[in-house]
Amino acid sequence: MKMKPWIIAGVSCLFAGTICCGAAVCAGALDQNRYRENLHLIDQTDTPSEAFTSVLMDVDNAEVTVQNGSKFSITAENVPQNSYHVAVEDDTLQIQLNSDSEPWYSYTHFGFHPFHAPAAKITVTLPAEYRAVAIANHAGDCTISGIHVSTLSVDLDYGDCQVKNVTAANLTADNDAGDLLLSDSIVSGTASLELDYGDLTVKQTEIGNLCKVKNNAGDVRLTDVSCGSSEMELDYGSLKLQKFTETDQAQSSAFTIFDGDVHCETSTLWNSSFDLEFGDFSTIDTALYGKNTIAMDYGDVQLNLHGKNSDYNVGYSYAAGSLNDSSRNQILISGDKTVVDATVTFTE
């Protein structure tokens, strides 16, 4: 039987594609070695003998890992020989990677295959508890796990950050473009988490005092989290609190959302003010204790409150009358009644 020309052409193209793909893989592997040689990239392990109580990392472009382990070590892969420095000065372990001297093609190159120069990686293993750990990274992911520190500070420009199983007195994390995860950790003092563009996830974490969150563009989700009080500000993105518990009954909390929804589920909040311009506010089996306000510009309110009707005094600023100041738990809902609908139910 005579084979059709289009079948022959298809098989030929498939065969040619396979050859090109194999060639690309080989070329990529060669590129990896070529770039390492041309850029003087090295692998290096350091174990400074001097004692230190703080760690300072200033990295331009690398994947950074700081982890707990039984033995102190610093390992680096694919770092420029003349731009990578490790030293102990003034009781501080200093790790620096400066990419100013690297040519543009150390980050990308032209070609038909998707291979790039080898990525720099720095891994720091810390066996003890330290006074302060500060990490600054221009471009690259950052993972911090299992360490014990008094003050932890993370500042990223481009990349995702994960902080897991960490014990700290205070935590500050600032990420310009990338996601931020905080999980399975204990912060006895204040946790300040700020993002410009990215999603924030906090789960299975205890925060002793203030939980401060700011996000310009991205969603924020806190699950199984406790804190003393809260201060959260979102410009564009939704806020979801699930099994979220505030423990300080004397402090006030503030939630400000410009464009996004707020949803609370199985949570407990004290003396909270919610200010939403564009978005809906809803709760499921959530306790709003103390004096609370919900200010809406454009959006609806659906409250399912934990407890009985008699546990709360719910009022509306656009309705006749006012709240009884002697009531234990007050909720004042304000907004334009022509654009805001409010419903309130109870679990008992």
Could you tell me what each predicted segment is?
Residues 1-348:
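Intrinsically disordered, low-complexity terminal regions
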